[in-house]
Regions:
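Membrane-spanning alpha-helical segments of multipass transporters and channels
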Residues: 1-192
């Protein structure tokens, strides 16, 4: 789901160009208006992933509805996070999303138990969204344990707030810097 969100920000423009029909659109309106596209495509991706896991791969799942719900929540969080990074930092945000993905794949406990990973991963893995998404999905597959599933989804909700802060607040001071970087890239005739 993270890779799908990353591909979305790579192939769909996040910048909303001025429109004659809506000249007074506020930055937050542009942010949410464009994000709807990312959200809908991400939800289709989550549905296809969940249905593929359940009916094509035929995983054993104690609660298919909660499995889909966890996929949908992960997709929402991941697409919003990627979108916010890209809105705030443009190409640097995309690169940052790739770096975060690599760190999470290596050290979020999905490949190997976190206890056998290097100490640095043991210290930082809980600051990333992957472990909470994986734990929520694991709960629906292996059986529910108390409120762990809902706790994981709640923690993923914190990343929604972080994403909104990045995309709506932190993006403001970076607009001029992003314009300078974009202008510099255009002058170089090398980069897209």
């Amino acid at each position: 789901l993270w890779v799908g969100a990353l591909i979305l920000v790579a192939i769909i423009h996040v910048k909303v160009l001025p429109d004659e029909k809506i000249p007074d659109a506020k930055p937050y309106q542009k942010f949410f208006g464009r994000y709807i596209t990312f959200f809908l495509i991400g939800q289709v991706q989550a549905l296809i992933t969940a249905l593929g896991d359940l009916f094509y791969i035929k995983i054993q799942c104690h609660n298919p509805f909660l499995f889909w719900l966890a996929c949908a929540c992960c997709s929402f969080v991941f697409t919003l996070f990627m979108y916010a990074l890209t809105v705030a930092f443009e190409n640097v945000g995309e690169a940052l999303a790739v770096v975060i993905m690599v760190i999470q794949v290596a050290g979020a406990g999905g490949s190997f138990p976190i206890e056998v990973l290097p100490a640095i991963y043991q210290r930082i893995y809980r600051f990333f969204p992957f472990p909470y998404g994986m734990d929520a999905l694991r709960e629906t597959i292996g059986g529910m344990y108390g409120m762990t599933y809902w706790k994981c989804l709640g923690i993923l909700g914190i990343y929604i707030i972080i994403s909104l802060l990045i995309g709506l607040v932190i993006a403001i001071p970076f607009r001029k810097l992003n314009m300078k970087i974009e202008h510099s890239k255009e002058k170089s005739d090398i980069m897209l």
